[in-house]
Amino acid sequence: RRPRHADAAGAVTPTREPEPRASAGQPRLWAVVGATGTGKTALSLDLAERLRGEGINAEIVNADAMQLYRGMDIGTAKLPPSERRGIPHHLFDAVEPSEEATVAWYQPRARAVVDEIHARGSDAILVGGSGLYVSSVVFDFRFPPRDEALRAELELEVEQHGTAPLLERLRALDRAAADGVDARNPRRVVRALEVASLGGEARVALPETPELWRPATRLVGVAVPRAELVERLDRRVRGMWAAGLLAEVEALIPRGIERGKTASRAIGYAQALAQLRGEVDEAAAIAETQTLTRRYARRQVSWFKRYPGIEWCGAADGRRGLDPLSTAGRPASEKSPTIPGPPA
């Protein structure tokens, strides 16, 4: 008799016999992506177990910019080691909150981890919702020029005079970049002007036909209907405060979170810091975090909808029906999605 197993919905189905890899033994790179709160983490764990059931080992690589930071657990919904089902996880808790982990820092490290996983003959599952971080690994992605001294000057200018003068100069150099940058985000304004001043493309975007870094790549998007996602995200934010986010942030202050350019501005953490300083009450901190989280989720959906060949599914549908061996090893750009995309 063929072995049988129960899937996430409780249905008992025959387990397929292990098959050889489609690309002459070449391990694959998976990317499980989507908006925050859609169930990417659970799906990635289920996928790794499905692969293991087919005789293929898999390891998970973090592609969430905030989960790189040690001690930032509750506000990032980081999965505790005890809940990782014995599956190796990489690039979680990689830097201190006082440090800055940029996408340019992340890309070579993530790719090195993927190469190490593939060298062991295992599949790598990249999971996260930070679009730029995912793209930097999955696609042939090059970064605009950098000048640390120039950026330091621009950051000082922002502190002294705000973003308005920088936006005016950016508009003179690159009108499209000025129109597209988030004027409320000083870091984005500084970076855009830095790149424009160096003669580069200030706006980082996927090309019309992006090339995959590894041909044996499969892109899986997790989508949730908009109304359901909004309710889920609002509930998650309230749950973070109930779970002790304020105490977590207070414990991170001696570790330098207030000095961390990225960590201190993370959604939820910036609001918790403001509450601890007495600038807002808890209700206002939660409400602002909910608003920013919903806005961020919309941007994530827009980003991932542009991925060619991505296969969209709901988290529960993916656990029941995602076949880890179908179209195995074929480039994502050659696959035809069979599941509708995320809600508009």
Regions found by a protein language model. Give the residues of each.
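Phosphate/pyrophosphate-binding catalytic cores of soluble transferases and nucleic-acid-acting enzymes
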Residues: 2-344
